[in-house]
């Protein structure tokens, strides 16, 4: 039976490249001269930490991160910006989580949407992905189009299309 998987995977190397590009841009921009703005990326914990001298520079770094994500073809929906917190010496810090995988709630929404479409396919949740199987490839392509039209808050990729 034909099937495919719905996943939400981020390329951590591309996120690392984005952070490095933003670091270079911060080092060369005139308005960041003399400010101790720092960015660091933790691949193991999949998080980015930003340390800036004030809120304006924090917003500028956030905009640079989003712009570089688009430029490097990393969906900005993968980034989950935390609250701005006060740090030592009058600086501000923010933690940015890099979301990877489909949460249980999102997977349930996807399955519910597929079942509500009345297409002759079955959807099953497997860890952080959803497997969709059906008798016809046309039905599977209709499901892909249905899921692309809706916004689930996470970027979706469709892999392992088997016939």
Swiss-Prot record:
Highest taxon, organism lineage: Bacteria
InterPro entries on file: DUF520, UPF0234-like_C, UPF0234_N, YajQ-like_sf
CC per GO annotation: cytosol
Keyword Nucleotide-binding belongs to the record: yes
UniProt key word Nucleotide-binding: yes
Keywords: Nucleotide-binding
GO molecular function: nucleotide binding
A Pfam family per the record: DUF520
Function: Nucleotide-binding protein.
Protein family according to the UniProt entry: Belongs to the YajQ family.
The name this protein goes by in its record: Nucleotide-binding protein Dde_2479
Annotated source species: Oleidesulfovibrio alaskensis (strain ATCC BAA-1058 / DSM 17464 / G20)
